[in-house]
Amino acid sequence: MNGIKNIKFIKWSNLIKLKIKKKIFYWAPFLTPIATPKAVINSAYSLQKYSNEFDCSIINFFGEFNIFKKDIVNKNIKIYNSSFNILRKYLPFKGKIKSRFSFLIIFILSFLPLRKLLSEERPDYLIVQLITSLPMFLVLIFNFNTKFILRISGIPRVSFFRKLLWKIALKKFYLITCPTESTMQYIKSLNIVDDDKIKVLFDPIIEVKKIKSETNKKNNTISHNNYCLAVGRLTKQKNFIFLCKAFKKVVTKYPNAKLLIAGDGEDKEKIDSYIIKNKLEENIITLGYIKNIFPLMYGAKLFILSSLWEDPGFVLIEASFCRTPTLTSNCETGPIELIKDKKNG
């Protein structure tokens, strides 16, 4: 009976607090600021904010997430850095051939470190979003206790080799998620994985407080009125040359029409050259990368998305949240599920 006095009773609430959280790692190396890293950060933040069951970490292999470090730290998301943390400064990223070369370097250098990290840290889940071939090879060659989840956005080009790799590797994946219904149906049509493994999972995009705060900040370096706005990487996907050609026709009818293009990328010289050649410098203005786009987005008379494909199109959702009228191309995925003609765009 005396021994009973020494027993310490623990409340159920304390037991819940002591519950071991499931570890989720994100693998999404990128070369240029695109929508995916924002999706990664928002996903990790949302899981930790709205659930006590998960502990999220982002793998920052070659310093790609350094530009988001402040945001990641503020959201209490862990970062796993590698010894190649400053490699991003030296990797070429403009141009298809140069970027492919950089991805090959990343694949080779990260093969063993990623295997070691997964073996030592033993995360419950690894969410794979970019350079997906590396985790696929790892899961084929080695055995992990980690459940691999593949995130597929857009309509990926499926060569014979890629289709073969996916068909073999995805048998060992736990889940495949897509941000839109269209993409999910496309992946199902490839017959590379059981339909039961493929799910639609919408990206957490809108941070209401942040957008309202950013919108109220003034950008002293940019001052424009009565303008249309387009935002995105200056690449083939965003189709800005087509947009410039279309806007040229608008200018012939409305000489004071103005289009601002915010973004940077491999097609910048081509776009600038077209603008100069057609004497549109007063009508079409390239701004470069704008860190806080919301004041411009909020002030635009019209937001234009000219992309060849999107999934789902983050900027389109953000523009809609800012109550800015939208005009979008009819992409295979994304906009067609977001915009109803003559209702919200």
Label every PLM stretch briefly:
Residues W12, W27-I34, S46, Y50-F101:
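N-terminal strand-loop element at the rim of the active site
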Residues P37-N42, N226-K249, L259, E266-D272, ...:
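A conserved mid-protein helix/loop that constitutes part of the nucleotide-sugar donor-binding site
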Residues F107-S110, V128-L134, I152:
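Short His-centered aromatic/hydrophobic patch
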Residues I155-P156, T183, L201-K212, R233, ...:
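Short beta-strand->alpha-helix junction loop in the catalytic core
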Residues F160-F161, Q185-S189, F202-H224, P295:
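Acidic anion/phosphate-binding donor-loop and adjacent secondary structure
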Residues F173-I198, I205-E207:
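A short, active-site helix/loop in glycosyltransferases that binds the activated sugar's phosphate group
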Residues Y289, L308:
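Aromatic "clamp/platform" in nucleotide-sugar-dependent glycosyltransferases that forms part
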Residues P325-S329:
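Short hydrophobic beta-strand element within catalytic cores of glycosyltransferases
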